[in-house]
From Swiss-Prot:
Keywords: Lipid biosynthesis, Lipid metabolism, Membrane, Methyltransferase, S-adenosyl-L-methionine, Steroid biosynthesis, Steroid metabolism, Sterol biosynthesis, Sterol metabolism, Transferase, Transmembrane, Transmembrane helix. InterPro entries: Methyltransf_11, MeTrfase_SMT, SAM-dependent_MTases_sf, Sterol_MeTrfase_C. One of its GO terms (molecular function) is 24-methylenesterol C-methyltransferase activity. The gene is SMT3. Catalyzes the methyl transfer from S-adenosyl-methionine to the methylene group of 24-methylene lophenol to form 24-ethylidene lophenol. This is 24-methylenesterol C-methyltransferase 3. Its main location: membrane. Pathway: Steroid biosynthesis; sterol biosynthesis. Disulfide bonds: none annotated. The chain crosses the membrane at residues 4-24. It comes from Arabidopsis thaliana (Mouse-ear cress). The keyword Coiled coil does not apply. It is found in: Membrane. The keyword Metal-binding does not apply.
Length: 359
């Protein structure tokens, strides 16, 4: 009986480990398994050191707004978090309003399709995805619009992941991905029939620089839409709790200082855009975008147990636990930012590049 009990116990443990890692582990689109977690383009033995360097650099986000090293550390950030994002969140690295009766996956797709509907592109036209990540939005937008989408991301590992997903989805004929800095894009002037950026330009040290580049590569008369991360009119810089929440979001998301909602249209006009529409998509009647974060707390704890185990046995690189812990804390700051109304990740601005350059 002792032998039978031992085998049964071993079987139950093996089954539990398999369930944790292989059943609960994959992200909603099954792009990653927990056992595949890595440091992106960073070798496993350097993940811990790179995390420490990242965390030290972003301790005081407001003091690094003009730092030349920001793009390099944004690249480091996405090497550290891309696998965890895919595994625990999905292939679309952004938020969306909760839609009653719809799954998180469907709500995400609706949010993405709205972006391309706003810029009114036709099948076959060329559009830019500025800050494309692993291409979740790109694939949804290409499938919906039949436009030719070119995405740019600063992270080479994300380029590899995006191309893999594009091919698996049968959308590689519509989706192209290049590695580059959206502050200095490798595209000619007047290349694209439209452009969008979904929660990505927040990584730019200066919004004017990335908006100028997007303006440059767009054709005259074309439209650009962006979902911006901003502090709202409710934010008070003299409120210590407000400051703590915003700094927590900045540190945990590689942001060189969040911008005020009031700065977005001003910057767009400064680089030459005509502002067609501006709206905070997080405001009522939209349902709370942070519900998914709150409802996923059990999953976060489960995932953290998985990460600790995998790190302990050498499957996941050292430092992965630190990265996951950082993201868990950041999720709490994001939730507090949403609940208090001082932060929005979806301040939408729709702009047009004039047919003729202003005199």
């Amino acid at each position: 009986m002792d032998s039978v009990a031992l085998y049964c116990t071993a079987g139950l443990i093996a089954g539990a480990v398999y369930w944790f890692i292989c059943v609960l582990g994959p992200a909603e689109r099954k792009g990653k398994r927990a056992s595949d977690l890595s440091g992106g383009s960073i070798s496993a033995e350097k993940v811990k050191d790179n995390y420490n360097q990242y965390w030290s650099f972003f301790r005081k986000p407001k003091e690094i707004e003009s730092a030349e090293k920001v793009p390099d550390f944004v690249d480091t950030f996405y090497n550290l978090v891309t696998d965890i994002y895919e595994w625990g969140w999905g292939q679309s690295f952004h938020f969306s309003p909760h839609v009653p009766g719809k799954s998180d996956k469907d709500a995400t797709r609706i949010h993405e399709e709205m972006a391309v509907d706003l810029i009114k592109v036709k099948p076959g036209q060329k559009i830019l995805d500025a800050g494309c990540g692993v291409g979740g939005p790109m694939r949804a937008i290409a499938a919906h619009s039949k436009a030719q989408v070119t995405g740019i991301t600063i992270n080479e590992y994300q380029v590899q992941r995006a191309k893999l997903h594009n091919k698996k989805a049968g959308l590689d004929s519509l989706c192209n991905v290049v590695c580059g800095n959206f502050l200095k894009m490798p595209f000619d002037e007047n290349t694209f029939d439209g452009a969008y950026s979904i929660e990505a330009t927040c990584h730019a040290p200066k919004l004017e620089e990335v908006y100028s580049e997007i303006f440059r590569v767009m054709k005259p008369g074309s439209l650009f839409v962006s979902y911006e991360w901003v502090t709202t009119e409710k934010y008070r810089d003299d409120d210590e709790e407000h400051k703590d929440v915003i700094q927590g979001i900045e540190r945990g998301d590689a942001l060189p200082g969040l911008r005020s909602y009031a700065d977005i249209a001003v910057t767009a006009k400064k680089v030459g855009f005509e502002v067609v529409k501006e709206k905070d998509l997080a405001k009522p009647p939209s349902k709370p975008w942070w519900n998914r974060l709150k409802m996923g707390r059990i999953a976060y704890w489960r995932n953290h147990v998985v990460v600790v185990i995998l790190s302990a046995i050498g499957v996941a690189p050292k430092g992965t636990v630190d990265v996951h812990k950082m993201l868990f804390k950041t999720a709490d700051y994001l939730t507090r930012g949403g609940e208090t109304g001082i932060f929005s990740p979806m301040h939408m601005i729709l702009c047009r590049k004039p047919e003729k350059a202003s005199e």
